[in-house]
Amino acid sequence: MNGITLHKGDLPDGLDFGPVVAVDTEAMGLNLLRDHLTLVQLSSGDGTAHLVQLDRTYDCPNLKKVLTDPDVLKLFHFARFDVAMMKRWMGIDCAPIWCTKIASKLARTYTDRHGLKDVAREIAG
């Protein structure tokens, strides 16, 4: 990994992730109505992770632009939670998306183990 870059509040202007970006979110808990979204993590696969620490205003136009860009595929594992949290707290419809958990369930029908650790272990070794 080349590094981790922490951004407070929003991504900097002009940051380009290319045609695909991996996305993960962190929240204060798992309750969509109660627990605030606190962090969005993004990586284009170049070895750098961009962490956006959000405040409760969710005033992050650059981050929202990336997450709603129709020309950028957003890659998630268990997208249902992340997409719902972003809709609830940021007010955006994140699209287009690809969920590796759903892909695993469709392609790996011989198992019921579709967590990120199990999928990564089998695919990446």
Can you annotate each of these PLM segments?
Residues 125:
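Nucleic-acid-contacting surfaces of polymerase cores and analogous helical-repeat interfaces
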